[in-house]
Amino acid sequence: MIEIKPYIEHAVLVGLITPSQPEERTKEYLDELAFLADTHGIVPVKRFTQRLDQPNTATYVGEGKLEEIRQYIIEREESRDEGRELVDVVIFDDELSPRQIRNLEKAINHRDRSGSGAKQPFGSVRVIDRTILILEIFLQRAQTSYAKTQVEMAHLQYMLPRLTRMWSHLDRQRGGGG
């Protein structure tokens, strides 16, 4: 008999060290985030931290740290033959704005395959924040249909502004009429 194992997601965790959140507290928060990920069935494989005065408004982390995260994901993809699993999700410790999620997903899910500097899509690594992770845990554990509906509503209300303009590349496409 063939045994089918459930797919286990692997995650990268990201946190910031700021003047109001010292390194030790960031480490504690990332430990808690790792526990939440594990509770949801996601295996944390790497942690990234960056020291900033405040989060980058466009991408939460700086350009160099974002590139470091992206390169780590690419290296894991390229070393799959060595038994390393792909990174499926990047989890940020703080709440991300809709713009930050879009920018992060765009940056993380593109890479240069030709050597020409042109970036090509290479995967669908999800970007989520602590709140989304907690909502997903609640949804996973909800027992009654009412509870599932309530959690799903909360999740959708949280995600609505994050989905706005997701398909903005279609904005200018209009049907022609004769």
Residue ranges and their predicted role:
Residues 120-121, 131-178:
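Extended, highly charged alpha-helical segments
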Residues 1-134:
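N-terminal accessory targeting/assembly segments
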